[in-house]
């Protein structure tokens, strides 16, 4: 008889919770709110005219304790200018299989080229797709931006870019 009573008590719990509001998240259909200071996916930023902020200094790669960042710098030329300084990051990769999300790379970046977004959906079923290159990391072009390579704003120096004195690309640059 005690075993029957245990089964009835178990069903009482089951039936009691059957009509309550579910407490589980419906994640894929309705993503939950993200805290404003959440650090998720990395992003390589651009200046307002579209030039890249990354100067290829590799400080982010040196600061990474998990060795998840690979950077190859290259020199800008008069014909091909990707950033306002002498150098730019020709190859930039982040291996999200190794990244621990610590943010030390963000702190090490002297030009604020690398930041972290609120995007947290980076799952994939293929390991090779979790090594993100520059094409996935670069911020999308906004209105007034030109895709590099293009010359710097007329009369501007690299200091003008670093100090925020440059606005969107003008007709002179286009």
From Swiss-Prot:
Molecular function GO terms recorded: 4 iron, 4 sulfur cluster binding; iron ion binding; NADH:ubiquinone reductase (non-electrogenic) activity; quinone binding
Family, according to the entry, reads as follows: Belongs to the complex I 23 kDa subunit family.
Give the originating organism: Mycobacterium sp. (strain KMS)
What reaction gets catalysed by this protein? a quinone + NADH + 5 H(+)(in) = a quinol + NAD(+) + 4 H(+)(out)
State the superkingdom. Answer: Bacteria
Subunit structure, per the record? NDH-1 is composed of 14 different subunits. Subunits NuoA, H, J, K, L, M, N constitute the membrane sector of the complex.
- Per UniProt, residues of the 4Fe-4S ferredoxin-type domain are 44-74, 90-119
Record-level GO BP terms:
aerobic respiration
* UniProt keywords, alphabetically: 4Fe-4S, Cell membrane, Iron, Iron-sulfur, Membrane, Metal-binding, NAD, Quinone, Repeat, Translocase
Q: Which residues cross the membrane?
A: none
Function in brief: NDH-1 shuttles electrons from NADH, via FMN and iron-sulfur (Fe-S) centers, to quinones in the respiratory chain. The immediate electron acceptor for the enzyme in this species is believed to be menaquinone. Couples the redox reaction to proton translocation (for every two electrons transferred, four hydrogen ions are translocated across the cytoplasmic membrane), and thus conserves the redox energy in a proton gradient.
Protein's UniProt keywords contain Iron: yes
For whether the record's keyword set contains 4Fe-4S, the answer is: yes
What's this protein's name? NADH-quinone oxidoreductase subunit I
Under the heading SUPFAM superfamilies, the entry gives: 4Fe-4S ferredoxins (SSF54862)
Q: How is the cofactor bound?
A: Binds 2 [4Fe-4S] clusters per subunit.
Query: Topologically, how does it sit relative to the membrane?
Result: Peripheral membrane protein
Q: Per its UniProt record, what NCBIfam families does this chain match?
A: NuoI, PRK05888.1-3
Tell me which cofactor or cofactors this protein depends on. [4Fe-4S] cluster
Binding-site list for [4Fe-4S] cluster 2? 64, 99, 102, 105
User: What EC number(s) does the entry state?
Assistant: 7.1.1.-
Tell me any Pfam family this protein matches: Fer4_7
């Amino acid at each position: 008889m005690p075993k029957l009573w245990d089964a009835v008590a178990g069903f009482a719990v089951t039936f009691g919770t059957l009509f309550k509001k579910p407490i589980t998240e419906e994640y894929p259909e309705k993503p939950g709110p993200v805290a404003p200071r959440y650090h998720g996916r990395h992003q390589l930023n651009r200046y307002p005219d579209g030039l890249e902020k990354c100067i290829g200094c590799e400080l982010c790669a040196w600061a990474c304790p998990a060795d998840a960042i690979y950077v190859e710098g290259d020199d800008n030329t008069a014909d091909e200018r990707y950033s306002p300084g002498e150098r730019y990051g020709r190859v930039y990769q982040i291996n999200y299989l190794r990244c621990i999300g610590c943010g030390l790379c963000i702190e090490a970046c002297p030009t604020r080229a690398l930041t972290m977004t609120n995007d947290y959906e980076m799952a994939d079923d293929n390991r090779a797709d979790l090594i993100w290159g520059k094409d996935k990391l670069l911020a999308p072009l906004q209105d007034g931006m030109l895709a590099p390579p293009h010359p710097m704003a007329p009369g501007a120096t690299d200091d003008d870019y670093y100090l925020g004195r440059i606005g969107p690309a003008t007709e002179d640059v286009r």
